[in-house]
């Protein structure tokens, strides 16, 4: 029972994970805030959220939804029938992807208001901003039970910390967080 719930949770949030990662991988270029400052004199969002990253993040996350829909349509994962057709998967993935990008941007906005520089730690905000955005947008088209929300949040924090520790040990990151 738990493994089925865990798998369903990860299946649901996968497009958001891919959208968030793709935005980082393919990002760069013009920041969405166009270099503008907020009324407090600090940048609205900063250089970390760019148009290219947003577009590629949403496209890649939505593509994952298409692949998920095809896999379900071919009964490869027939136990996850509560998500519906291929089109349902694509629509959900689009909403999750947009939510992930918006959540990340909101997280950056909050960090700027708290005077936390880009790349500096903001515990839980750094790990969950995109997930909260994705869950909020995804809930519009495919609500999920609170157990899945808890699993997604806990899993995300765990994987984020584990990934950072591994990157630190490998010398890819300067800090473990």
Swiss-Prot record:
Q: Where's it mainly located?
A: membrane
- Give the record's keywords alphabetically: Cell membrane, Lipid biosynthesis, Lipid metabolism, Magnesium, Membrane, Phospholipid biosynthesis, Phospholipid metabolism, Transferase, Transmembrane, Transmembrane helix
Bilayer disposition of the protein: Multi-pass membrane protein
This protein's superkingdom? Answer: Archaea
Instruction: Supply the EC number(s).
Output: 2.7.7.67
What cofactors does the UniProt entry give for this protein? Mg(2+)
- The record lists the membrane-crossing segments as 6-26, 54-74, 90-110, 124-144, 148-168
Cellular location of this protein?
A: Cell membrane
Instruction: Name the top EC class.
Output: transferase
Q: Which reaction does it catalyse?
A: 2,3-bis-O-(geranylgeranyl)-sn-glycerol 1-phosphate + CTP + H(+) = CDP-2,3-bis-O-(geranylgeranyl)-sn-glycerol + diphosphate
Give one GO molecular function term.
Answer: CDP-2,3-bis-(O-geranylgeranyl)-sn-glycerol synthase activity
Gene Ontology CC entries for this record: plasma membrane
Q: Which GO terms describe its biological process?
A: glycerophospholipid biosynthetic process
The pathway noted for it is: Membrane lipid metabolism; glycerophospholipid metabolism
Q: What does this protein do?
A: Catalyzes the formation of CDP-2,3-bis-(O-geranylgeranyl)-sn-glycerol (CDP-archaeol) from 2,3-bis-(O-geranylgeranyl)-sn-glycerol 1-phosphate (DGGGP) and CTP. This reaction is the third ether-bond-formation step in the biosynthesis of archaeal membrane lipids.
Family, similarity comment: Belongs to the CDP-archaeol synthase family.
Per its record, how is this protein called by name? Answer: CDP-archaeol synthase
